[in-house]
């Protein structure tokens, strides 16, 4: 794998990892609540910063899940084959992500060309820019939307998918070239450096506030925390007190929830603190909850996360994340964007995307390459 042939040790996870679909469902529901709260017809009590900012926490859950899952799959492949096939990895990612994403991007562009929607309106400035639609399209197609600060709503949410794609481009190469031990150090370095980068951006960078939650160098510690959790999974199991804490039916959920709550509260009170250290608290809380649920599917929380209806929402979470955006648009007051019909339309469009785009391409991947058709991406 490297010139020194450093061994990558697999985590003690095999087969389908329990609770991940449930975590995805929880994540995407946070996004839906955060977005629907500001739409026309929604109860007035929902249109508060404490509710509308829930979407950021939901996306951060997705990033932790992605780092954990992708690292687990790569380590598992190395344990099975003695190497990681980067070509096959990127082919699997392409089958999983690109069809639904490009279908959404293309249909939104078609709706714009037909005059049904407006891609020239900037959400941050509320200004019209006739040159903006093409810029938004190019950022979306090249997965650089996380650096498009003057965004339009319809392509806005693709910033998180852009972060995921940038992670996919970098992390597998780190594992292959550096090996397990050095990759562990890289993940730790990212966790330690990202808060300092956010601090430098706050003190000296002339950047909009949105950059702290979207630009890769500012948010990579969330992904790195998930990677680290996968690489240390077996070692944590060998620590009796740590394992007892993580498998306790209440303690990890309480501690994780308190950490996330502290980060959440800091974002409402002190934006600089939230940018620098609040995100660290949030990452720690999420990774504790993630470790609890994948280790303890038999606890009350684990059973909820693995219920069939919950797992179905989790399986549909990628399409649901893609298609909620045009219906949960707070600047448009139309029949399709009014609560609660906008939620029903979001789920309906997501089911169509999942049933007729995602699943056929996953089956095609299985038929051509022999990999399971089950969704394995951490993307929203």
Predicted regions: what they are:
Residues 71-79, 111-114, 176-181, 228-238, ...:
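Structural signal for the C-terminal ends of transmembrane alpha-helices
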């Amino acid at each position: 794998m490297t010139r020194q042939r450093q061994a990558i040790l697999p985590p003690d996870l095999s087969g389908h990892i329990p609770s991940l679909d449930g975590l995805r469902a929880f994540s995407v529901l946070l996004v839906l609540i955060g977005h629907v709260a500001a739409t026309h017809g929604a109860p007035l009590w929902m249109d508060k910063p404490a509710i509308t900012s829930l979407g950021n926490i939901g996306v951060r859950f997705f990033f932790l899940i992605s780092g954990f899952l992708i690292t687990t799959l790569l380590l598992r492949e190395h344990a099975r084959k003695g190497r990681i096939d980067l070509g096959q990895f990127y082919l699997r990612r392409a089958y999983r992500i690109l069809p639904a994403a490009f279908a959404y991007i293309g249909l939104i562009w078609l709706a714009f060309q037909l005059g049904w929607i407006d891609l020239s309106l900037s959400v941050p400035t509320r200004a019209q820019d006739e040159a903006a639609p093409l810029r938004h399209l190019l950022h979306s197609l090249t997965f650089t939307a996380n650096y498009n600060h003057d965004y339009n709503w319809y392509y806005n949410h693709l910033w998180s998918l852009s972060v995921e794609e940038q992670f996919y481009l970098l992390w597998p190469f780190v594992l292959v070239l550096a090996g397990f031990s050095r990759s562990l150090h890289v993940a730790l370095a990212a966790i330690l450096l990202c808060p300092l980068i956010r601090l430098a951006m706050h003190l000296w960078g002339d950047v909009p506030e949105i950059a702290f939650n979207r630009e890769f160098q500012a948010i990579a510690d969330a992904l790195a925390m998930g990677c680290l959790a996968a690489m240390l999974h077996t070692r944590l199991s060998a620590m009796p007190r740590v394992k007892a804490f993580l498998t306790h039916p209440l303690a990890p959920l309480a501690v994780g929830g308190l950490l996330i709550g502290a980060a959440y509260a800091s974002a409402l009170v002190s934006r600089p603190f939230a940018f620098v250290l609040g995100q660290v608290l949030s990452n720690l809380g999420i990774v504790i909850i993630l470790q609890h649920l994948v280790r303890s599917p038999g606890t009350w929380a684990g059973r909820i996360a693995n219920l069939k209806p919950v797992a179905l929402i989790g399986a549909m979470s990628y399409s649901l994340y893609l298609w909620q955006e045009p219906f949960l648009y707070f600047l448009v007051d139309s029949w399709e964007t009014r609560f609660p019909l906008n939620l029903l339309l979001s789920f309906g469009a997501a089911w169509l995307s999942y049933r007729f785009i995602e699943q056929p391409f996953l089956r095609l991947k299985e038929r051509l390459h022999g990999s399971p058709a089950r969704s394995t991406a951490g993307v929203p």
